[in-house]
Amino acid sequence: MCYLSRMSSQQMQLTISGFENRIKILEDLMNEFDSNLYIRLKRECDFKLPKEYDVSIHALTILMKRHLSNMEPIDCYQDLDTGTLQTMLIFCCTLRMIEHYEKSLSNINFFSLSNDLKRLEEYNTSCSVLLSLYQRQLKKISTTIESYYLADTLRHNQNILNLCERIYNIQKLLNKREKASVLRH
């Protein structure tokens, strides 16, 4: 990635555009996944165990490659290094997971069965861990990419802030439910 420092601003802009387009393509692909995405991800990798982080990243990569292999063309992904591809995968999966989780909130009564509440907390844990995976992966590759380039293409500061806010709002809902439950008893 050291060639980036030798690029002209026009070349840099084209490269940034290319990455943004790929991220958009990957996001669209993730959105095409069936509603059982959470179950499939859960089956292939355990989000809760820190020691499984690398295994989880590997499993996400396999999952996406399996999906991409049924589509044409796939050549545009060949020049992406593993770290960059994994980072984008984690970002897409984080977005998809949180969207799926938020949708489930509208169908659950906060005062209903304890297994519903357990499921909510499990979703929240998965979202949080995916986000930390994404941030950790960014930190890992930041040593090989110019900082301004990283900020413009991969960091997605605003997106990370939005994800944090959404996770925080979900946690607030869970806390509210817990307080209301205590008051009722």
UniProtKB/Swiss-Prot annotation:
Keyword Aminoacyl-tRNA synthetase belongs to the record: no
Domain of life of the native organism: Eukaryota
Keywords: Chromosome partition, Cytoplasm, Meiosis
Cellular compartments annotated: Cytoplasm
GO biological process, any: chromosome segregation
GO CC annotations on file: cytoplasm; cytosol; dynactin complex
Keyword field contains Ribosomal protein: no
Function: Required for correct meiotic chromosome segregation.
Name used for this protein in its record: Meiotically up-regulated gene 5 protein
